[in-house]
């Protein structure tokens, strides 16, 4: 279920929802909510980069100078997002500025839910304009660490936990009988989550994807 408000999150959990998406962004979660989440054994998907995308283009974002981002992005899209009129509209958008405040609440709630033992899965709203597939998944993982999760738990949230949350038992972990979907990295992301960017090869069903 997609939501914004804490009261709605409590209601839908009581009603039997399987998953909460887009974060609680109006209030800090309380102990009752954390306990309810654990009691129901459901999944929380923060999607904080969705919030980022609603206001970050009010000026030029830092990642516009990231070589990892620039390697694949369409330059025409960057130029469009740099447009002064577009930036001004976003700066003057009440909803955009509201989502900016909501992001702070969402980040605090990730940390509280993680410390409380709630099952957290990585997810994004990528694919829409300004929400770059691949790069925003990386950003989401990095922000989850900033919010207080350990790098290893973010990796789990992005693989095995996420697969379990959508009842996909044949993916998410490397085990006999499962799909051999994996990436090979040049540095250890458990030491620094930014190392998820050091991709050397991608494998799907045991087959290396051509570069």
How should each PLM-predicted stretch be described?
Residues 191:
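Small/polar (Gly/Ser/Thr/Ala-rich) solvent-exposed segments
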């Amino acid at each position: 279920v997609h939501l914004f408000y804490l009261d709605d999150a409590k209601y839908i959990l009581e009603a039997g929802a399987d998953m909460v998406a887009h974060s609680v962004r109006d209030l800090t979660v309380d102990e009752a909510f954390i306990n309810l989440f654990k009691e129901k054994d459901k999944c929380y998907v923060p999607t904080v980069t969705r919030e980022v995308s609603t206001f970050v283009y009010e000026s030029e974002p830092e990642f516009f100078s990231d070589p990892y981002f620039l390697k694949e992005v369409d330059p025409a899209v960057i130029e469009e997002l740099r447009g002064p009129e577009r930036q001004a509209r976003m700066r003057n958008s009440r909803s955009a500025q509201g989502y900016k405040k909501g992001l702070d609440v969402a980040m605090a709630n990730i940390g509280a839910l993680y410390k409380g033992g709630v099952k957290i899965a990585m997810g994004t709203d990528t694919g829409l304009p300004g929400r770059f597939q691949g790069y925003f998944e990386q950003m989401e993982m990095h922000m989850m660490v900033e919010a207080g999760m350990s790098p290893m738990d973010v990796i789990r949230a992005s693989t095995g936990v996420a697969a379990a949350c959508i009842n996909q038992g044949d993916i998410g972990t490397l085990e006999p009988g499962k799909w051999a979907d994996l990436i090979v990295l040049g540095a250890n992301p458990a030491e620094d989550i930014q190392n998820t960017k050091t991709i050397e090869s991608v494998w799907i069903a045991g087959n290396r994807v051509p570069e």
